[in-house]
Amino acid sequence: MPAKKRKTTRQRRRSKARSASANTAALRKVSKERDQARRKLRAAQKKLAKAKKDASRKLAKLRKEAARKVAAAKKTRAPSKKGRKKATRKKGGGRSRKTARKVSTMKRGRGRPRKKA
């Protein structure tokens, strides 16, 4: 049986190149998978954002409609009731605008209450 032939440098180089190409192929596969996953995630995020927008839009629409209905109901209320209400309602005092408001009144009710001496 003849002895095993030694590989020539050219053969050695070729095999090395092949292994390198295999490595790059694996890398390519991994990067492809990563890109696919990224794309999927992006699509899902877009879908979610769209759903959120739609939901908020629907809510706003409903709110507007409800407000409109309430306003309409108020308009159609009996006028006698309205008049009665106006007559019995007490007007708020409000603040007198003769003098500027004191700073102490602004601070009232903040922090620790003062001791009554």
From Swiss-Prot:
Region span, Disordered: 1-117
Domain of life (superkingdom):
Bacteria
Q: Which UniProt keywords apply?
A: DNA-binding
Q: Where is the composition biased (Basic and acidic residues)?
A: 51-68
Q: Where is the composition biased (Basic residues)?
A: 1-17, 39-50, 71-117
Single GO term (MF) = DNA binding
Known role: Binds DNA in vitro.
* Name listed for the protein in its UniProt record: Histone-like protein Hq1
What is the species listed in this Swiss-Prot or TrEMBL entry? Answer: Coxiella burnetii (strain RSA 493 / Nine Mile phase I)
The primary gene name is: hcbA
